[in-house]
Amino acid sequence: QEISRYIEDGTLDLGLTGIDWIMENESDIVVVQDLIYSKVSLRQARWVLVVRDDSPYQKIEDMEGKKISTELVNFTKKYFADKKINVQVEFSWGATEAKVVEGLVDAVVEVTETGSTIKANKLRIIHELMKTNTQLIANRAAWNDPWKRKKIEQIKTMLVGSLQAMGKVGLKMNVSKKNLEKVMSLIPSLKAPTVSTLSSTDWFAIESIVDAKGTRELIPRLLEEGAQGIIEYPLNKVV
């Protein structure tokens, strides 16, 4: 939560933090790279306005004069002020959703990825305040230093490569010339599969990067169409 402040004041040259906490701290930093992932998916998370499922509140305007609890106090205050809705915003030290469940506050502003916990606690989302994701950020002086900037760019490349590899695997296989076209038609790829001629001119080696979740169906189909010696291997980076 405080990383953007350390980046801004030069304590750190480079760091990872969320868009939400950059906005909360109003930090003056350089955004080097958006990194779209969250705890359970490769999607952005959302900051949402949440009320009890049985509450009468249906929209953000219904919060006029109400009490809201959140960890994102400064952003929330500004958000409601910009909409000219008067609310009392208090800081939450944790267990934010429990406060609205127990009736300690009228609503909470909380971060969510899937919304499943909110539903499980018999709560309801009535408004989305913003989407957030991790960003690689740099101190402005560090970014303007050629040596440091080169190192920062290298780190960015490795992080992006790791993200692009998530959920993907590599596939290798051998295919005879007569089955090549049928097998190739089944293989998805980032661009096009790599095809190499084996020592026997009637056989080819195919290599491709595919979504891991699809291999359970893909591999049996490849075998049916004549692929042999199929190897599936994990990926660390795709650059």
Regions from the PLM with identified roles:
Residues 17-33, 37-43, 54-239:
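Small-molecule-sensing regulatory modules
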Residues 8-10, 103-104:
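Alpha-helix C-terminal capping segments
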